A protein has these predicted regions:
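An aromatic- and glycine-enriched ligand-binding surface/loop that stacks and positions planar moieties
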Residues: 1-12, 114, 118, 122-125, ...
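Conserved, well-structured interaction surfaces
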Residues: 9-86, 108-112, 121-135
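Short clusters of hydrophobic/aromatic residues that line enzyme substrate/ligand-binding pockets
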Residues: 19-24, 91, 128, 173, ...
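Generic secondary-structure boundary/loop-capping signal
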Residues: 32, 83-89, 102, 178, ...
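Short, hydrophobic secondary-structure boundary micro-motifs
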Residues: 57-58, 91-95, 174-176
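Short, well-structured active-site flanking segments
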Residues: 83-95, 157-164
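Short coil/linker segments at helix-helix boundaries
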Residues: 88-111, 115
């Protein structure tokens, strides 16, 4: 296509330009950020699992199962993103990594990573409610859908069909396809899982804390310039 893949010119966001031209290399900054962000998510999920019996705050006992269903769903989501892009990746589920652990873990076959992803999603399916408590939260059906996609990527077509077919009747396409690009079309009848983005200026910046700003970056980079 004739549009730029990001930034204001062909010399802006060089990492994305190289990916767009299929000339990227292993030190591409955009690919490094995905690796970093996904493993930050894995680390946080592992922290939650590690301290499962130590948390105590109002309402925790009531929502504990749902909360840990979300933890398992998100860890599966992060590892799935990693294995889709990088193939064999370092795998750890017990404890957290520190800066001193950098470079100490070896990659494992992606089949082992997929096994952990499937296990986490089964745990999420068993723990998550069928109806989301608020927009942006995963449900048991969200976990079902992601597991079906995981099966497809492994060419487990029969397993994928079995788990995805019951979901078909639960979601419908909007009568106006263009509505999905509008605010009023967010979290609509076709939405299985939807990350909640924000356009507020107090959340985004261009350097010192990028991992907390993905939602705003998504709005800025995918919307019409000047529309947010």
């Amino acid at each position: 296509d004739n549009s730029l893949c990001g930034g204001e010119s062909a010399s802006d966001v060089i990492g994305l330009q190289k990916i767009d031209d299929m000339i990227h290399d292993p030190v591409n900054d955009q690919l490094k950020r995905i690796w970093q962000y996904m493993y930050e998510g894995v680390n946080r999920a592992n922290y939650m699992v590690e301290n499962k019996d130590k948390f105590d705050f109002p309402g925790f006992d009531r929502r504990k199962n749902e909360l840990y269903g979300e933890v398992h769903f998100l860890r599966a989501f992060f590892y799935f993103e990693l294995v889709k892009i990088y193939g064999d990746v370092p795998l750890f589920t017990n404890g957290r990594l520190t800066a001193g652990d950098s470079g100490t873990l070896q990659r494992v076959p992606k089949s082992e990573v997929y096994s952990v992803i499937e296990s986490d999603l089964q745990a999420a399916i068993n723990a998550l409610p069928a109806k989301k408590s608020s927009d942006g939260r995963a449900t048991s059906f969200t976990a079902h859908a992601l597991l079906g996609k995981v099966y497809l990527y492994q060419e487990k077509f029969a397993e994928a069909a079995n788990i995805l077919e019951p979901l078909i009747g639960l979601y419908t396409l909007p009568s106006d396809p263009g509505s999905v690009f509008l605010v009023e079309g967010e979290n609509g009848p076709e939405s299985v899982f939807e990350i909640q983005h924000s356009k507020e200026s107090n959340g985004w910046n261009w350097g010192w804390m990028p991992q907390s700003t993905e939602g705003n970056f998504g709005v800025i980079h995918h919307g019409i310039r000047g529309s947010v």
